[in-house]
Amino acid sequence: MTQDYELVVKGVRNFENKVTVTVALQDKERFDGEIFDLDVAMDRVEGAALEFYEAAARRSVRQVFLEVAEKLSEKVESYLQHQYSFKIENPANKHERPHHKYL
């Protein structure tokens, strides 16, 4: 199975106590360029290399996508269950209606 989506680090900005990493979601099959990007802000870690922040940002964004996908899946499943559910009546519990025959 090939991976159609890729998380790409687009940039890193350093602030006094924070580091912000911009991570973009790209669809390699259907779109040229980015679908969207997210800025992930993290506290600065003493002695941490740039790769540390990039990996942490990717993990954070991946986790967000997994949580969103799970919620969407639950909503779709709930919708489909509601949409296609029907009540089956037991004929033994049904009151027979009298039928009148006209001659």
Curated annotation (Swiss-Prot):
It holds the Pfam family DUF1327. InterPro entries: Phage_ES18_Gp24. This is Uncharacterized protein YdfR.
